[in-house]
Amino acid sequence: MNVFVLNTGRCGSTTFIKACQHISNYTSSHESLLDRTGDQRLAYPKNHIEADNRLSWFLGQLDNKYADDAIYVHLKREREAVAASFSKRIDFGILKAYEQGILMHQEHRYPASDIALDYIDTVNANIALFLKDKTNKIDVSIETVNTDFIGFWELIGAEGNLDEALDEWTINYNAS
């Protein structure tokens, strides 16, 4: 069964996949198909764990392809911390795309933190709505990751080295 780690970004998805690389009965990647379109965008191998914040823009297609035949993780981090991290990246990446492409601001009309909070709330609401009728799901919070990741490990029937996986959470990957 496939596992999809849905998230806003800036919430530990890189570390999540580093931890999952200690699982022997699943493959795992971070943003592995981000440049693909059409059927190839969601063409993940079986028994694969994928973390990609852009999946929040493909929830309809994800539901059409996998429906309830996947495990879904809603990876979260305290919203003010996510906003602070995103605010440093207002001029590139997903936050720039959101501000200029979705909100249609050609220049910065609001503080970066306001744009970031709006993006975070929008993406989390979309993910929550998508997960409303899913049976194979779990919330994982960075603030309680030592407990939550063990629950995730058990939910997917992971095999491998849990202690090494948990140790990954002590390393700050992709920080800003």
Predicted region positions:
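Short, solvent-exposed loop/turn segments at secondary-structure junctions
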Residues: G9-C11, H22, L34-D35, R54-S56, ...
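PAPS-dependent sulfotransferase catalytic core
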Residues: M1-D52, A175-S176
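Short catalytic-loop micro-motif centered on adjacent basic/acidic residues
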Residues: H48-E50, I138-S141
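PAPS-dependent sulfotransferase catalytic domain
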Residues: L59-L129, N136-D139, T147-G160
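A conditional alpha-helix N-cap/helix-loop micro-motif detector
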Residues: D52-L55, I120
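C-terminal accessory extensions appended to soluble enzyme cores
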Residues: G157-S176
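Flexible, charged surface loops at secondary-structure boundaries
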Residues: D39-K46, K65-A67, K132-D133
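A short, structure-level motif marking secondary-structure boundaries and short turns
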Residues: M1-N2, Y44, A112-S113, D133-T135
